[in-house]
């Protein structure tokens, strides 16, 4: 559960106080990174793009890792993102089914790398939310909402009926064909 590559961080920062602006505006951002150092770097990257605040004349007030409240229940997650491809910037909405938001984000990064050849630095997560099962749009997520869902049994191994018939070494390989 806790072995995710990306962790969710909340970074709080502001520009340094100046004689004209003694109480600068405080900005809070939730973002995904592999560690705290990269989370801070990403925070300054976005803040420089959004507001006129740079790392050289700014300060980090707090950085906290955000953990899932109940990481044992399965939820549907919606992720709104923007990514840079070879042809330009694109907006996208993705849905994933996972026990944690970090797991869903991990799935998203893996899928974007495999389907679109877009690596981690080129992806900007705009928003994430838990989506109610009635509001899910993607068929890939909807297929798991049915109560009569069945999974095919593709690997059948015949077990011996009693312990007496169990042997360590077999004379022939087992036939697993169904």
UniProtKB/Swiss-Prot annotation:
The keyword Transmembrane helix does not apply. InterPro entries: Ribosomal_eL20 (IPR028877), Ribosomal_eL20_dom (IPR023573), Ribosomal_eL20_eukaryotes (IPR021138). Gene3D superfamilies: 3.10.20.10. GO terms for biological process: cytoplasmic translation. Keywords: Ribonucleoprotein, Ribosomal protein. Pfam families: Ribosomal_L18A. The keyword Kinase does not apply. GO terms for molecular function: structural constituent of ribosome. GO terms for cellular component: cytosolic large ribosomal subunit. Belongs to the eukaryotic ribosomal protein eL20 family. This is Large ribosomal subunit protein eL20. It comes from Oryza sativa subsp. japonica.
